[in-house]
Amino acid sequence: MDTLKPSDLTTELLNTGQSGVPLVICSEAPRVRKRIESAGYQEVKINKELSKRLLDIPKEDRPKLVEKALKGMLNYHVPIFVTDFEMLFDPRYEIDVLRFFCEKARIINVAIKWPGQFTDGKLTYATPEDPDYHEFDCNAYQIRIVQ
C-alpha cells in the first residue's frame, strides 16, 4: 500500500498507468475529481446499473452471479473512476471489493471513490454493528490510497 496526498495525483501519474494498482480515493478535495476527469477516466456508477441487471436474475441465484454481472458492466477499455458501489458490501454477495478492483486494475487504470473511512492502514465501510460492515487491512492489497 502506498499513500498519496491529493497534490501527488498528477495528470501524468494518472495517464501513465498505475502498474495494475488501483487508486483508492479517500479525499474529498475537489481537485482530485477534477484531475481524474481531466485524465480521461470514465465515471462508472455501480449501484443503479447493477441493480437493474440483478432484477432479471432470481433472488436465490443473485449471490453467485453478482460478480459476473459486475464484470460484464465494467467491460471498459478506458480508465474508469468507480463511484456509488455500496451495494457490493452486501454480505449476501461475499465480494472482496478491494480484490475485485485490484484484478480489474491489471487490465485498465482504475480509481475508486471509497465510500467509507481510511484510518490506521485500514479501509472500513459502515460501522461494526451494521451487517454491511467491512474492514480491509490495506497492507494485504496492492493499492494506492489518496487522502
State the predicted function of each range.
Residues 20-24, 76-82, 108-112:
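Generic beta-sheet signal
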Residues 1-73, 122-130, 134, 142-147:
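Extended, compositionally biased accessory segments flanking or bridging domains
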Residues 45-50, 84-85, 114-116:
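Short loop/turn segments at strand-loop or loop-helix junctions that form parts
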Residues 71-75, 102-103:
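Short, charge-rich binding segments
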Residues 75-93:
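Conserved P-loop NTPase "ATPase switch" module shared by AAA+ and STAND
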